[in-house]
């Protein structure tokens, strides 16, 4: 019964191997960059801090953490129906995001090895962490009779090119928001163990410290290159990446509110807390952060959610393709307008915040 339900819900490349989720603007991205420009970067301004972080990576605090215990050795058929579908989707998205980080960091470590040895070793050790995370998540998927072909994913995904400074903005935020997502879920389930539907959540406390250390590494790199933070362009780009990361998470998670409900969380409240804490953390390095406490911020995101619900209904309708296009077009324009208005909201300058943290 479970197998037949699984086969109706998920498309498989071959038995037990799931077809990767279709790439959309909201799915985890794979990145590449200008490796030569990265290799030429002078990090001497903040080399002491980078060396301290490298020593943390070498210590490998989680070397023995990602080991499955007897709690996994049971049938998970009782997680079924929509909860099962959403949980597998959560595992897949998380695995894809971690694997994306592994590929980027591994390639950076390889390309910089003979030109920037400190950065190269940091990236190589971070790729070790990301590989562990991705492998652990993929193994968890196998408890639900599915897995991802990570080799196929490597070859089939489109890679987004970002210049190094944009890689730093994006990956810093990805790691820090990952920290706050994992630690928030962990703390909630420690307080409400009855909502822990699967043992992977017990691993999130140590796991999130990997994310935090990775974020600190990108913080240190940006401080080593003050031009990434100190001019008017940096302010505009920091706003852009903050908005992109926050909006993507919010729109994704609200669509999957039933998953968060299955572990006792309200998706809206959870996301608002994670966004607030990530925004606050980003203020320690970014020259500006978003005014996420302004009621307009979430009002416009909610408008986009309603638009996306209409887009889904149109996509699932039996109308001809050209009719769907003209039905969708004004909704895309509306979403674009909402994001433009969000981007133009007055940001919060962080100079005072950074001096107080110092």
UniProtKB/Swiss-Prot annotation:
Pathway named in the protein's UniProt entry: Porphyrin-containing compound metabolism; chlorophyll biosynthesis (light-independent)
Disulphide bridges, residue numbers: none
InterPro entries reported in the protein's UniProt record: AcsF (IPR008434), Ferritin-like_SF (IPR009078), Rr_diiron-bd_dom (IPR003251)
Pfam families: Rubrerythrin
Top-level EC class as recorded in UniProt: oxidoreductase
Molecular function per GO: iron ion binding; magnesium-protoporphyrin IX monomethyl ester (oxidative) cyclase activity
SUPFAM superfamilies named in the record: Ferritin-like
Catalytic activity: Mg-protoporphyrin IX 13-monomethyl ester + 3 NADPH + 3 O2 + 2 H(+) = 3,8-divinyl protochlorophyllide a + 3 NADP(+) + 5 H2O
EC numbers: 1.14.13.81
UniProt similarity note: Belongs to the AcsF family.
Protein function: Catalyzes the formation of the isocyclic ring in chlorophyll biosynthesis. Mediates the cyclase reaction, which results in the formation of divinylprotochlorophyllide (Pchlide) characteristic of all chlorophylls from magnesium-protoporphyrin IX 13-monomethyl ester (MgPMME).
Name of this chain's protein: Magnesium-protoporphyrin IX monomethyl ester [oxidative] cyclase
Gene: acsF
């Amino acid at each position: 019964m479970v197998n037949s339900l699984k086969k109706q819900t998920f498309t498989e490349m071959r038995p037990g191997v799931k077809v990767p989720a279709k790439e959309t603007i909201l799915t985890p991205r794979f990145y590449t960059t200008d490796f030569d420009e990265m290799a030429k970067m002078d990090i001497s301004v903040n080399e002491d801090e980078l060396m301290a972080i490298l020593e943390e990576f070498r210590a490998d605090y989680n070397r023995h953490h990602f080991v499955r215990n007897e709690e996994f050795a049971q049938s998970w058929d009782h997680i079924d129906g929509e909860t099962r579908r959403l949980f597998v989707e959560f595992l897949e998205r998380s695995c894809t995001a971690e694997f994306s980080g592994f590929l980027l960091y591994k390639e950076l470590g390889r390309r910089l090895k003979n030109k920037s040895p400190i950065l190269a070793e940091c990236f190589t050790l971070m790729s070790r962490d990301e590989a562990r995370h991705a492998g652990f998540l993929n193994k968890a998927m196998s408890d639900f009779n599915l897995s991802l072909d990570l080799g196929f994913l490597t070859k089939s995904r489109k890679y987004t090119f970002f210049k190094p400074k944009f890689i730093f903005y994006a990956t810093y935020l990805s790691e820090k928001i990952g920290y706050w997502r994992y630690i928030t879920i962990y703390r909630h389930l420690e307080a409400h163990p009855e909502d822990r539907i699967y043992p992977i959540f017990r691993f999130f406390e140590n796991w999130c410290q990997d994310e935090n250390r990775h974020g600190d590494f990108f913080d240190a790199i940006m401080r080593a290159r003050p031009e990434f933070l100190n001019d008017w362009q940096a302010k505009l780009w920091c706003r852009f990446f903050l908005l992109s990361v926050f909006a993507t998470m919010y729109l994704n998670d609200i669509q999957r509110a039933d998953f968060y409900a299955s572990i006792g969380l309200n998706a809206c409240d959870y996301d608002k807390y994670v966004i607030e804490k990530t925004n606050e953390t980003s203020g320690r390095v970014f020259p500006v952060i978003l005014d996420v406490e302004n009621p307009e911020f979430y009002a416009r995101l909610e408008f986009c959610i309603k638009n996306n619900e209409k887009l889904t209904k149109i996509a699932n309708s039996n109308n001809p393709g050209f009719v769907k296009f003209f039905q969708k077009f004004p909704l895309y324009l509306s979403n674009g307008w909402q994001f433009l208005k969000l981007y133009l909201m007055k940001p919060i300058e962080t100079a005072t915040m950074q001096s107080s943290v110092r």
